[in-house]
Amino acid sequence: MGDQPFIPPPQQTALTVNDHDEVTVWNAAPCPMLPRDQVYVRVEAVAINPSDTKMRGQFATPWAFLGTDYAGTVVAVGSDVTHIQVGDRVYGAQNEMCPRTPDQGAFSQYTVTRGRVWAKIPKGLSFEQAAALPAGISTAGLAMKLLGLPLPSPSADQPPTHSKPVYVLVYGGSTATATVTMQMLRLSGYIPIATCSPHNFDLAKSRGAEEVFDYRAPNLAQTIRTYTKNNLRYALDCITNVESTTFCFAAIGRAGGHYVSLNPFPEHAATRKMVTTDWTLGPTIFGEGSTWPAPYGRPGSEEERQFGEDLWRIAGQLVEDGRLVHHPLRVVQGGFDHIKQGMELVRKGELSGEKLVVRLEGP
């Protein structure tokens, strides 16, 4: 299938960070070139992640585009693409604020897909629903990889079974990453147990948690040790502060185990030598590494690129089959000013158990 006769406009609207480190709507932003192995997308909906709100200072490339999660309509395909056609709907992730590709970010009118970190939107799934998935899929997959746990098999009728229950503690079980991860853990045969606020217990259980605990309950680490018969080996920390790290280390069983967080964790709270530690870095899913400041800088990796491709092949099938579902949504209709306003809501932590999605209506 050759290139389609779509000519990008000379300028587009995008959300960026200017020379003064201010988030701004740029109405004269450039449009990206179309690589031979990718597709050109008119962005219809975007989701806002906490990471989007942190792209300032040393993390910002002035005038590069913001945004990770997008869903949209294919308007052109590269000459090497054979499985997608104009008019198809796709969703995926971008490596925002990447200095090598400053004109590729989700918060823009047009974007091009990146690597194989994207998939077709199944029938019955809206743009808004699809836009809520990419960062969660990518981070959940990276977390499972770092914990040493296998990804689900999309062809298996039933999850694999273990001779004994294998529990995985998910601290912050009502976050968007947690709800995707718990579903994937279930599909891989593991048993998630979660902590969150009581008003989100039903959400965590609906996304795979076997049991949910109030994170403020007294002596909770001991309660979880008792619940898991002191055999908990895996903990995923979706909050990552001194309290969450300390708690996870206390809940892991006497034989030790593995702790993974979504951000660099406070090392002074990692108090047990029998517990291995790591943390996820979103851009590694593309295999491109990261140019962010220490400790986030990372070289590119072919192994990580291949993992990202495998993950998205699996996750895309699970979404298509209805076995992997999105986080509850708070949808806003509007333009790029609404994305900017939504970023402030997310930055201030004003959402609980919801993913903020903006359905684009225009600049």
From Swiss-Prot:
It holds the Pfam family ADH_N. Its EC number is 2.3.1.161. The keyword Transferase applies. Disruption phenotype: Loss of lovastatin biosynthesis. It catalyses: holo-[lovastatin nonaketide synthase] + 9 malonyl-CoA + S-adenosyl-L-methionine + 11 NADPH + 19 H(+) = dihydromonacolin L-[lovastatin nonaketide synthase] + S-adenosyl-L-homocysteine + 9 CO2 + 11 NADP(+) + 9 CoA + 6 H2O. GO terms for molecular function: enoyl-[acyl-carrier-protein] reductase (NADH) activity; lovastatin nonaketide synthase activity; NADPH binding; oxidoreductase activity; oxidoreductase activity, acting on NAD(P)H; polyketide synthase activity. NADP(+) binds at residues 51-54, 174-177, 197-200, 215, 262-263, 280, 351-352. One of its GO terms (biological process) is polyketide biosynthetic process. Changing residue 139 to V: Reduces catalytic efficiency. Trans-enoyl reductase; part of the gene cluster that mediates the biosynthesis of lovastatin (also known as mevinolin, mevacor or monacolin K), a hypolipidemic inhibitor of (3S)-hydroxymethylglutaryl-coenzyme A (HMG-CoA) reductase (HMGR). The first step in the biosynthesis of lovastatin is the production of dihydromonacolin L acid (DML) by the lovastatin nonaketide synthase lovB and the trans-acting enoyl reductase lovC (called the lovB-lovC megasynthase complex) via condensation of one acetyl-CoA unit and 8 malonyl-CoA units. Each MAT domain from the lovB homodimer binds one lovC molecule to form the final active lovB-lovC megasynthase complex. This is Lovastatin nonaketide synthase, enoyl reductase component lovC. It comes from Aspergillus terreus.
